[in-house]
């Protein structure tokens, strides 16, 4: 997923300034949201599985997991995801994705905010989300089947809010926080619990743990930023 800059106009001369460089930690956040979106929106291809398997380090295994510090849940979840990717081949991971997320009737996992918040698909939470997306200059691309309240699509939106690009501006941290708290934090925990506990979830149980750990880091970071924000 290629990060894209945004251009801003300053003054009255029509001068177009290059965007300020993105801080390393912000690029890392965008990359994490991009990974979550990729894992939830489409079955993992062999290249993605190989990348995940390599991130734990050569020969990493249970000893590595046990040695991870108890106060670093994201690190433990990351290592566990890498280990899970080494323990399953790409075809089996794709079969698992299909078993969990794809069905001719009702899939095992329906990661849509409207369903969790209102009990049905295409309800008021989706309408409210679309209003907020319009305010950000974002909209679902034509031909995309998933609605905007799919958890993967919401993570892609967070990535775009951090990076900007394609006509959308980078958003300040306070606006990112508001979007996260309203459209993701309110229901993603229950959804990830369902994914973790679903029959047939092996690799994707580790995916759920990883996403939950990352969201908790985001929530804590937003809280700290709010504490230091100026009125």
Language-model features, listed with the residues they occupy:
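Surface/interface-facing alpha-helical segments and adjacent flexible terminal/loop regions used
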Residues: 1-231
């Amino acid at each position: 997923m290629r990060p894209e800059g945004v251009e801003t106009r300053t003054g009255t001369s029509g001068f177009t300034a290059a965007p300020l460089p993105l801080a390393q930690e912000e690029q890392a956040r965008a990359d994490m949201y991009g990974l979550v979106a990729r894992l939830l929106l489409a079955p993992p291809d062999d290249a993605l599985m190989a990348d995940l398997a390599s991130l734990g380090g050569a020969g990493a295994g249970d000893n590595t997991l046990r040695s991870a510090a108890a106060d670093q849940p994201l690190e433990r979840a990351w290592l566990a995801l890498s280990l899970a990717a080494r323990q399953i081949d790409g075809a089996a991971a794709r079969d698992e994705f299909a078993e969990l997320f794809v069905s001719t009737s009702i899939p095992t996992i329906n990661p849509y905010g409207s369903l969790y918040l209102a009990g049905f698909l295409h309800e008021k939470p989706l309408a409210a989300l679309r209003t907020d997306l319009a305010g950000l200059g974002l909209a679902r691309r034509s031909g995309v089947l998933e609605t905007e309240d799919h958890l993967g699509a919401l993570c892609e939106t967070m990535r775009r809010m951090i990076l900007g690009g394609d006509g959308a501006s980078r958003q300040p941290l306070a606006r990112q926080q508001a979007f996260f708290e309203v459209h993701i934090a309110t229901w993603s925990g229950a959804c990830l619990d369902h994914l973790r506990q679903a029959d047939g979830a092996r690799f994707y149980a580790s995916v759920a743990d990883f996403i939950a750990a990352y969201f908790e880091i985001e929530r804590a970071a937003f809280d700290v930023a709010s504490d230091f924000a100026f009125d």
